[in-house]
Curated annotation (Swiss-Prot):
Protein name: ATP synthase subunit b 2
TM spans (from-to): 34-56
Function: F(1)F(0) ATP synthase produces ATP from ADP in the presence of a proton or sodium gradient. F-type ATPases consist of two structural domains, F(1) containing the extramembraneous catalytic core and F(0) containing the membrane proton channel, linked together by a central stalk and a peripheral stalk. During catalysis, ATP synthesis in the catalytic domain of F(1) is coupled via a rotary mechanism of the central stalk subunits to proton translocation.
Listed GO MF terms: proton-transporting ATP synthase activity, rotational mechanism; proton-transporting ATPase activity, rotational mechanism
Name of the encoding gene: atpF2
Amino acid sequence: MAESHGNAHGATAHTEADGGHKAPFPPFQKETFASQLVSLTIAFVALYLISSRLALPRVRQTIDDRENTIKGDLAQAQKLKDDSDAALKAYEAELAAARARAQAIGNETREKLNAAAEAERKALEERLSVKLADAEKTIASTRAAAMSNVRGIASDAATAIVQQLTGATPDSKLVDSAVDASMKG
């Protein structure tokens, strides 16, 4: 039994032609080559017809739909870009106008403040010049009073010095004229 199994296996495992040569692969047999070409042609024609009638129109429709979607998206993107460019230009124009208004307001405020400061400075100068004139008058009157006191003190001192040195009382007119001459020169 074991032998018959081995023989059976060997007989079915190898297909040999007469004389011990192997048979060629069936698609390469010369006898069936023409019928295989006809079968292939029929299969490719059928495949082409099915593809061209069913699959290719669907693919073409999908490609056309995608192309239209892309064109629509590009057109919408261009429109949005144009709108954003217009909005940007309007924003820049508004910004420039706002800057110009701010500059004008700043200049106007600066001029008002400068005018107010100038008016206040002039008023202060006038008040100071009045105070200065009053101070000069006060100084002059104080100087005159001090000088008159100095003249009296100098006369008294000169009289006391001469009296101390000489022992005699000098003439008050001579002392006054000597003090006046000394104060002038």
